[in-house]
Amino acid sequence: MPEKDEKEQHMRKPDWLKIKLNTNESYTGLKKMMREKKLHTVCEEARCPNIHECWAVRKTATFMILGDICTRGCRFCAVKTGLPTELDLQEPERVAESVETMGLKHVVITAVARDDLKDGGAAVFAETVRAVRRKNPFCTIEVLPSDMLGNESSLQTLMDARPNIMNHNIETVRRLTPKVRARAKYDRTLEFLRRAKEMHPDIPTKSSLMVGLGETKEEILETMDDLRANNVDILTIGQYLQPTKKHLKVIKYYHPDEFAELKEIAMQKGFSHCEAGPLVRSSYHADEQVNQAQVNMEARKAQGEQQRV
């Protein structure tokens, strides 16, 4: 029998991608609370490899709002796709209550793409930011929205809620974008990040890149340059892992030393912060990336509003 093409063979995960699961009481308690409050986390939906570290050790979580069904079907992502559910207008308060119960110092709020909504879900997204801040003035808030089809007024709605970090992922290099990302456009992502920075220059912007999909090193560096040209402050780089056999295959597993080199290059290119490693995901160690001066200002503002009520 002829040998299978190298890219078609099943690639065995290297040792550095094998992690020890930690399912202590903190982890199981958080999982129970999420179900009781009918909340979704991208940690579970996207099968993040860091879920046990974040939930059991760091006690952080990334909430996924606007339902758990995405209107897009990106070929790298494990989140369910199809016809989405109706908006849950009580969701912002439930997220805020959960953040308070967990005692979080930093929360990431992401969402499925809601291309069925005129504003892409921006109004509910913004209200979730405000609700979390009302109950948790010193909890820093990072948002990770879809591109909302490039709707500038939707972006303005979200930015005016004053998150502490605006995160929007480039995901892959320009050449691979049509293959990897459903309905998304490379240049629209760059424009989204540029406009966010123009609207509120003091709010750090952030993006994430997966590697292992067949990109070249030169393409990775070009993507870094494109992000910096649009004033993106923070970059995360992680290994793509195939969620199921229906998703894109892994072409290459990068060695930790290669990630260390990419991080060094990113810092030389002017990013204020870069996390790079095999298990790094967009929200990894996000609490270390905030602008503390902006955090304190937003907290004082929230406390003042509470006192006036």
Curated annotation (Swiss-Prot):
**Which keywords fit this entry according to its UniProt record?**
4Fe-4S, Cytoplasm, Iron, Iron-sulfur, Metal-binding, S-adenosyl-L-methionine, Transferase
Protein name, per record: Lipoyl synthase
- Family note: Belongs to the radical SAM superfamily. Lipoyl synthase family.
Q: Name the catalysed reactions.
A: [[Fe-S] cluster scaffold protein carrying a second [4Fe-4S](2+) cluster] + N(6)-octanoyl-L-lysyl-[protein] + 2 oxidized [2Fe-2S]-[ferredoxin] + 2 S-adenosyl-L-methionine + 4 H(+) = [[Fe-S] cluster scaffold protein] + N(6)-[(R)-dihydrolipoyl]-L-lysyl-[protein] + 4 Fe(3+) + 2 hydrogen sulfide + 2 5'-deoxyadenosine + 2 L-methionine + 2 reduced [2Fe-2S]-[ferredoxin]
NCBIfam families in alphabetical order:
lipA, PRK05481.1, PRK12928.1
Lineage of this protein's species?
Answer: Bacteria, Bacillati, Bacillota, Bacilli, Bacillales
On cofactor binding, the record's note says:
Binds 2 [4Fe-4S] clusters per subunit. One cluster is coordinated with 3 cysteines and an exchangeable S-adenosyl-L-methionine.
User: Where in the cell?
Assistant: Cytoplasm
List, alphabetically, the PANTHER family matched: LIPOYL SYNTHASE, LIPOYL SYNTHASE, MITOCHONDRIAL
- Per the entry, which co-factors are needed? [4Fe-4S] cluster
Per UniProt, [4Fe-4S] cluster 2 binds at: 70, 74, 77
Top EC class, one word: transferase
In what residue span(s) does the Radical SAM core domain sit? 56-272
Q: Name one Pfam family in it.
A: Radical_SAM
Q: What's one GO MF term for it? A: 4 iron, 4 sulfur cluster binding
> Which Gene Ontology cellular-component terms appear in the entry?
cytoplasm
Pathway entry? Protein modification; protein lipoylation via endogenous pathway; protein N(6)-(lipoyl)lysine from octanoyl-[acyl-carrier-protein]
Q: Which EC number applies? A: 2.8.1.8
By its UniProt entry, which SMART domains does this protein fall under? Elp3
Q: Binding of [4Fe-4S] cluster 1: at which residues?
A: 43, 48, 54, 283
Primary localization class, coarse: cytoplasm
Q: Which InterPro entries match?
A: Aldolase_TIM, Elp3/MiaA/NifB-like_rSAM, LIAS_N, Lipoyl_synth, rSAM
